[in-house]
From Swiss-Prot:
It comes from the Eukaryota. This is Elongation factor G, chloroplastic. It holds the Pfam family GTP_EFTU. It is found in: Plastid, Chloroplast. Belongs to the TRAFAC class translation factor GTPase superfamily. Classic translation factor GTPase family. EF-G/EF-2 subfamily. Expressed in cotyledons and at lower levels in adult leaves. The gene is CPEFG.
Length: 783
C-alpha cells in the first residue's frame, strides 16, 4: 500500500530523512512558530487552519486593534483590504504552472492525473478509472461509465513548484469543458494512445489549444499495449496536426517488454523496476542496441534548439555541444514560443514515465509571468484597451470559467486570477453586468473536496462561494478599476429532446434543476414550447443529454419521461432579395405607420446574422432604426420553412419613410417582422442540417457491412486507413439525423468488435424531399 511507503527515520548525522514511496525527501526544519509541512507539501500562506473562528469560516475578516483606524467614508471591504496580511506567497509566481491534460477519449488522461497526484504526495493511494476509484472522476456517472464528464481541478507540488491541474473530458459531447479549461490555462499536456495515434478528438483539442495559443508538451501513453508504436505516433503528430515535434525521449522496448525511456537531454536511460508502484526508478547507461538511435534523435533535437540562440549555434557548429542547463533553457524557449512541441513517452497505467513528465512540466511549460499579459476593455468604452499584468500589486482581474453546484456550499464559481488578489469577505465587480458581488468563501478545490483559504493571489485557480449573478465567461474585477476580459465562445447545441416530469408534483423541481444545470453548462439549453406544451432540452449529443437526464434524477430527485431525439436544423437563404413593406394601422386615435425597404443577402457558412443600415438623408429617423433591428432579430429565431433558427444572413435597411405623428419604434418593429416574412420567402429559403464526421474502427471482415450501412444513412465515405491488429478505419461524413441509435446497429453488425467516434463537421443543405417532410410537419403542428 502507498500509505505503508512513508517512513521517517533519523540519519547518523542526526537529521531526519522522509522516505515517501521510495524517494527520499529531507524536510526543511522550521521554527516552532511555523506550521509543519506534511509529506513535502509546502504550506500555503492563505490556508485557513482547522481552528479558524466562525466569522472567518463564514467569510468575514477581523481587523486587529493595532491596525490604523478605519476611514469613516466607507465601511465595506475593498478587493485588497482584507488580503494584505495574507498576501505573502508560499511559492513565487515564476514557480506556478497552470496546466490542463487533454486528449481523445480513453487515451489515459485521468489515469495520468492519478499518478501525478500520487507521486507528488497529493494522494496516498492510486485511484483507477476502471475500478471507479479515480479521485478526479468524482461524479457517480463518471465512476459508472469510466469516462470523464466534467473538468476537475486540483493543486499539487513538484520540485518546489505549485502545479494547478485541470483534467478534461475526451468525449466529443463534452468538448466545451476542454474549451473553457484551455481559455484559463498557461500550458497543457496532450496525451496520445501509442496504439491509436492521433485520433479525431485529439485533432479537436489540438485546434482548441492553437486557438488560445497554449504551449503544450506531448506524452505518448500506453507504451505497454499490444501494437504500441511511439515513432508512428510521432509521424502522425506531424501529418495530422501539422506540428513540429521535438523528441526528448525514445522508448526502451514496447508492448510487454517496455522498461523505460532514454532521456535525450541527459543521454541516460531511465528504468523503472516495478517496485513501490513506480516510485522507484534509476538512471543507467543507454542500452547498446539503442545507442545509435539515441544519437540520431539527439542530433535532430540539437539542430532544432540551437537555432534559437546565435551564440549556442556558433559553438555547436564548432563542435561544442551545449550543457544540460542550456539545452533545457532552449527547449523551454522553443516550447513557450510555439517553435516546436516536446514529445515524451511512457505508460501511466504501468507507472512508468510520469516523473519525467512532471519534470518536463516544470522545465518547459510557462509560468503566468511568461505568457502575454491579459488584454481587456473598458466596460464604459470598448474601444479602450486595458492591460492586466500578472502581478499581485495590479488591480484584481479574474475570469469565471466554470459554475458548479455543491450540495454543501451551494453554487461555486471557478475563477482564474490574472492579476491582483482577493480575500474572503471582499467585494468584486462583475464587469459585464456592472453588479457588485460579495465573496462569501474562497475555496481551493481538489476534485470535489475543498479547503477554505483566506486569500487568492495572481495565478491561482480558485472557487468562490456566494456569487449570485456571475455566469461562465464573465469578468470579475476590482470595483475601482473595472475591466472586461475577452469572453469565451460556446458551441450551439445540435440535438434536442422533449422532456416532462412523471408526476405534476415534480414540475417545479425539474425547472429548478434545469436552471442550475444550464448555469453550469453553457452548451446545454432548455426552453418551453407552449404550442406543444412541453419542455425541450438541447445539447451536444445523445450522451450529453443522457447525462443531463441522469443528473436530474440523482441530484434533483426528478423522474422524467424523455422523447425521441430531434435534430437542431437551421434555416438560411440562397440568393439576394429586396422587399418593401409598409405597416399601416388606423383604428381611432393615434395610428401606426412604418415603411421600410430591406435587402436580405446570404453570407458564408458560420457567419451568423448581421444587420446593416444604409439609410441616407434621414429617410428613417435614427431613433426608429433600433425598432427595425429588434424586429428582425426576434424573427431570426423562427424561420419561414419549419420554424428553425435562421443563420448566415445579412439584413440591410435600404430605405423607408415615416409619419410625423403615427410612426413609432413599435411600428417599425412590426414592419421589420413583415419584411422578414416576405423577404425570406423571396430569397430562396433552404434548410441546413448538422453533418457529423464519423470515424469507424472495425475488423476487416465487417468492413463491407459498415460501408454499406453508412451509405444507407446518406453517408459520404472520405477515406480508409489501417490500424494494428487487422483493423480498418473508415472516415466519413454523415447527417446527424441518420446517426441516432447507431451504436446498437454497429454492435449488432460487428458482434461488438467495432467502435466509432463522432463530432460536428459542418452544416449543409438538407435534400429537398426531407426539407418538404420537415416543412409539412411544422404546418401540421401549426394547424
Amino acid at each position: 500500500m502507498a500509505a505503508d511507503a512513508l517512513r521517517i527515520s533519523s540519519s547518523s548525522s542526526g537529521s531526519l530523512v522522509c522516505n515517501l514511496n521510495g524517494s527520499q525527501r529531507r524536510p526543511v526544519l522550521l521554527p516552532l512558530s511555523h506550521r509543519a509541512t506534511f509529506l513535502g507539501l509546502p504550506p500555503r500562506a492563505s490556508s485557513s487552519s482547522i481552528s479558524s473562528s466562525i466569522p472567518q469560516f463564514l467569510g468575514t475578516s477581523r481587523i486587529g486593534l493595532g491596525s490604523s483606524k478605519l476611514s469613516q467614508k466607507k465601511k465595506q471591504f475593498s478587493v485588497f483590504a482584507a488580503a494584505e496580511a495574507e498576501a505573502k506567497r508560499a511559492v513565487p509566481l515564476k514557480d506556478y504552472r497552470n496546466i490542463g491534460i487533454m486528449a481523445h477519449i480513453d487515451a489515459g488522461k485521468t489515469t495520468t492525473t492519478e499518478r501525478i497526484l500520487y507521486y507528488t504526495g497529493r494522494n496516498y493511494k492510486i485511484g483507477e478509472v476502471h475500478e471507479g476509484t479515480a479521485t478526479m472522476d468524482w461524479m457517480e456517472q463518471e465512476q459508472e461509465r469510466g469516462i470523464t464528464i466534467t473538468s476537475a481541478a486540483t493543486t499539487t507540488f513538484w520540485d518546489k513548484h505549485r502545479i494547478n491541474i485541470i483534467d478534461t473530458p475526451g468525449h466529443v459531447d463534452f468538448t466545451l469543458e476542454v474549451e473553457r479549461a484551455l481559455r484559463v490555462l498557461d500550458g497543457a499536456i496532450c496525451l496520445f494512445d501509442s496504439v491509436a495515434g492521433v485520433e479525431p478528438q485529439s485533432e479537436t483539442v489540438w485546434r482548441q489549444a492553437d486557438k488560445y495559443g497554449v504551449p503544450r508538451i506531448c506524452f505518448v501513453n500506453k507504451m505497454d499495449r499490444l501494437g504500441a508504436n511511439f515513432f508512428r505516433t510521432r509521424d502522425m503528430i506531424v501529418t495530422n496536426l501539422g506540428a513540429k515535434p521535438l523528441v526528448l525521449q525514445i522508448p526502451i522496448g514496447a508492448e510487454d517488454v517496455f522498461k523505460g525511456v532514454v532521456d535525450l537531454v541527459r543521454m541516460k536511460a531511465i528504468v523503472w523496476s516495478g517496485e513501490e508502484l513506480g516510485a522507484k526508478f534509476s538512471y543507467e547507461d543507454i542500452p547498446e542496441d539503442l545507442e545509435d538511435l539515441a544519437q540520431e534523435y539527439r542530433a535532430a533535437m540539437m539542430e532544432l534548439i540551437v537555432d534559437l540562440d546565435d551564440e549556442v549555434m556558433e559553438n555547436y557548429l564548432e563542435g561544442v555541444e551545449p550543457d544540460e542547463a542550456t539545452v533545457k533553457r532552449l527547449v523551454r524557449k522553443g516550447t513557450i514560443t510555439g517553435k516546436f512541441v516536446p514529445i515524451l513517452c511512457g505508460s501511466a497505467f504501468k507507472n512508468k514515465g510520469v516523473q519525467p513528465l512532471l519534470d518536463a512540466v516544470v522545465d518547459y511549460l510557462p509560468s503566468p509571468v511568461e505568457v502575454p499579459p491579459m488584454n481587456g476593455t473598458d466596460p464604459e468604452n470598448p474601444e479602450i484597451t486595458i492591460i492586466r499584468k500578472p502581478d499581485d500589486d495590479e488591480p484584481f482581474a479574474g475570469l469565471a470559467f466554470k459554475i458548479m453546484s455543491d450540495p454543501f456550499v451551494g453554487s461555486l464559481t471557478f475563477v482564474r486570477v490574472y492579476s491582483g488578489k482577493i480575500s474572503a469577505g471582499s467585494y468584486v465587480l462583475n464587469a459585464n453586468k456592472g453588479k457588485k458581488e460579495r465573496i462569501g468563501r474562497l475555496l481551493e478545490m481538489h476534485a470535489n473536496s475543498r479547503e477554505d483559504v483566506k486569500v487568492a493571489l495572481t495565478g491561482d485557480i480558485i472557487a468562490l462561494a456566494g456569487l449570485k449573478d456571475t455566469i461562465t465567461g464573465e469578468t470579475l474585477s476590482d470595483p475601482e478599476n473595472p475591466v472586461v476580459l475577452e469572453r469565451m465562445d460556446f458551441p450551439d447545441p445540435v440535438i434536442k429532446v422533449a422532456i416532462e416530469p412523471k408526476t405534476k408534483a415534480d414540475i417545479d423541481k425539474m425547472a429548478t434543476g434545469l436552471i442550475k444545470l444550464a448555469q453550469e453548462d453553457p452548451s446545454f439549453h432548455f426552453s418551453r414550447d407552449e404550442e406543444m406544451n412541453q419542455t425541450v432540452i438541447e445539447g451536444m449529443g445523445e450522451l450529453h443529454l443522457e447525462i443531463i437526464v441522469d443528473r436530474l434524477k440523482r441530484e434533483f430527485k426528478v423522474e422524467a419521461n424523455v422523447g425521441a431525439p430531434q435534430v437542431n436544423y437551421r434555416e438560411s437563404i440562397s440568393k439576394i432579395a429586396e422587399v418593401k413593406y409598409t405597416h399601416k394601422k388606423q383604428s381611432g386615435g393615434q395610428g401606426q405607420f412604418a415603411d421600410i425597404t430591406v435587402r436580405f443577402e446570404p453570407l458564408e457558412a458560420g457567419s451568423g446574422y448581421e444587420f446593416k443600415s444604409e439609410i441616407k438623408g434621414g429617410a428613417v429617423p435614427r431613433e426608429y432604426i433600433p425598432g427595425v433591428m429588434k424586429g428582425l432579430e426576434e424573427c431570426m429565431s423562427t424561420g419561414v420553412l419549419a420554424g428553425f433558427p435562421v443563420v448566415d444572413v445579412r439584413a440591410c435597411l435600404v430605405d423607408g419613410s415615416y409619419h410625423d405623428v403615427d410612426s413609432s419604434v413599435l411600428a417599425f418593429q412590426l414592419a421589420a417582422r413583415g419584411a422578414f416574412r416576405e423577404g425570406m420567402r423571396k430569397a430562396g429559403p433552404r434548410m441546413l442540417e448538422p453533418i457529423m464526421r464519423v470515424e469507424v474502427v472495425t475488423p476487416e471482415e465487417h468492413l463491407g457491412d459498415v460501408i454499406g450501412d453508412l451509405n444507407s444513412r446518406r453517408g459520404q465515405i472520405n477515406s480508409f486507413g489501417d490500424k494494428p491488429g487487422g483493423l480498418k478505419v473508415v472516415d466519413s461524413l454523415v447527417p446527424l439525423a441518420e446517426m441516432f441509435q447507431y451504436v446498437s446497429t454497429l454492435r449488432g453488425m460487428t458482434k461488438g468488435r467495432a467502435s466509432y467516434t463522432m463530432q460536428l463537421a459542418k452544416f449543409d443543405v438538407v435534400p429537398q424531399h426531407i426539407q418538404n417532410q420537415l416543412s409539412s410537419k411544422d404546418q401540421e403542428v401549426a394547424a
